[in-house]
């Protein structure tokens, strides 16, 4: 089938930022100016097109990443608007994995905030080129210069302004384009749809010349011929500068910075121009590589071409009440059409694609065909999970999956009535399949079901969805910290599992050595030689170990960051079986951990508090009392920003305490930073409680 838009005229972008920086408002303006929506939807009215879930409209925040498509200057722009709240970081993670470029939105007053740093690191990890939009330039305390400085210092990036603001705060009226040398001011009556382009105002001439010189110097390095031309005193054309900025952005050597006020309808059209001019098309980025599932050492390149064999990544699952199971995927090579059979390379199972849908928030448009570079939703894949690769069965390939963050908070949940029991289990299983950062597990000791997630809001939304979408009523316990266990020194176990009770017995023998594996999770090494344990029993030993690690020996918390080396063992011709070696693995790891200095770990949160100067002492004292370690302080207009690392267990109820200490004038945000050893006295208390 013929392509409507050439691949090089397509952009797959994400809009990301800290909560309240104005991402969704910016996206709503983009939809308005590109003609997708004929009326501007506002977040504060609960009418934003991209925030379509009931909970999003009620709370004025983005929870899921919503996808939409618009056109600008004959280019197709696929946009994913992602959440800014730290509890929904998995939505950002999975979006960045499949996007080619990103727009990072910053609040001109607050600058770089904690979640801005998190999404920036996520974008770095996936090598995503980006441009920055300094939003809310009309607010009191807005500073373009300070924001650019924070992007440079806090994010260790190379921000290059390609615009200069005209005025600030309530005098902000437009931007000066450093590339074209034109001043752009926006008409309020037409909601910014019409704008005036004129010469640079005289009072900005010196600043314009200095900033333009800096910009050209930074980007001309990308092209030797242009650098020579520039050093020779020749003027570069607008096209040459745009080409240089584009090359430098795609190479991730610079980050172009623009500014505006989306809410006041200023600066959004130039931002769209920058998306088209500077961000890559699917063919501009490095070709996706995967591995052959049958020979993992064989790398397979997947060129962005419709004629190549299919390779696509499932990055999100969603249950639609009218359509059923939707699998969102990004096609890297080849094409998908309705009715075709595809291979799930992760499971080895074949499935038939029912229908293909292009999504616009929660509205959908049925299409028959999608090609390389497209992001589509598929109906009919029943077996796919987040992170699976679907491909042509003649060329199996597994693409790199997603990094799934570990949950830090859990609550006990139980059905309100017996009638709700089965429905609750089914609903939780469905939600866990949709959201890999949400986990469900049973506590054998208490017979309770525990649900774990990224924060209180995350679990609150899950419980809310149980009632609204699945009509299941549940009682929920108080939030608990998701502690972990680990080891502090190497250990060894020589374990025999022998059982004789008439008939065929059970025999398994394994010798394992374990050592701490900080930050690397679980690792299993098979060092068996000479067939002392047959090959078919190695996997059951590994499985027995992994299952035993789900419940640690101190307090039943999962054991993490441990390397296991299987070094020796023996078997019996008749009595050995997979089950016997599974039990042996489980017994051996418990024995080895007991000798390896097991300790408890607790989640440590990165906390930022912005407080008026007069409450600084109270806020600092309170953080110290919560076992907090202050990392830095920064003066703001009439306020102080304090960054500290505080154990999550000390942060329950902090919002209420902070409000009362500062008469509601201070704000805070927090996100997971790392796991750290629990102090001995506290660990003892926790072990006693669990015992």
Curated annotation (Swiss-Prot):
Function according to Swiss-Prot or TrEMBL: Catalyzes the GTP-dependent ribosomal translocation step during translation elongation. During this step, the ribosome changes from the pre-translocational (PRE) to the post-translocational (POST) state as the newly formed A-site-bound peptidyl-tRNA and P-site-bound deacylated tRNA move to the P and E sites, respectively. Catalyzes the coordinated movement of the two tRNA molecules, the mRNA and conformational changes in the ribosome.
Q: What is this protein called?
A: Elongation factor G
Protein family according to the UniProt entry: Belongs to the TRAFAC class translation factor GTPase superfamily. Classic translation factor GTPase family. EF-G/EF-2 subfamily.
Q: Does the keyword Repeat apply?
A: no
Q: Which InterPro entries match?
A: EF-G-like_DII (IPR053905), EFG_II (IPR041095), EFG_III (IPR009022), EFG_III/V (IPR035647), EFG_IV (IPR047872), EFG_V (IPR035649), EFG_V-like (IPR000640), G_TR_CS (IPR031157)
Q: Which residues form the tr-type G domain?
A: 8-283
Q: Where does GTP bind?
A: 17-24, 81-85, 135-138
Cellular localisation: Cytoplasm
Keyword Cell division among record annotations: no
| GO cellular component labels | cytoplasm
Which cysteines pair up through disulfides? They are: none
> What is the source species?
Nitratidesulfovibrio vulgaris (strain ATCC 29579 / DSM 644 / CCUG 34227 / NCIMB 8303 / VKM B-1760 / Hildenborough) (Desulfovibrio vulgaris)
- Matches recorded under SMART domains: EFG_C, EFG_IV
Task: Enumerate the UniProt keywords alphabetically.
Answer: Cytoplasm, Elongation factor, GTP-binding, Nucleotide-binding, Protein biosynthesis
Q: Which GO terms describe its molecular function?
A: GTP binding; GTPase activity; translation elongation factor activity
* HAMAP family assigned to the protein according to its UniProt record, in alphabetical order: EF_G_EF_2_B
Which Gene3D superfamilies does this entry report, sorted A to Z?
Answer: 3.30.230.10, 3.30.70.240, Elongation Factor G (Translational Gtpase), domain 3 (3.30.70.870), P-loop containing nucleotide triphosphate hydrolases (3.40.50.300), Translation factors (2.40.30.10)
An annotated GO BP: ribosome disassembly
Where in this chain does the entry annotate a coiled-coil region?
none
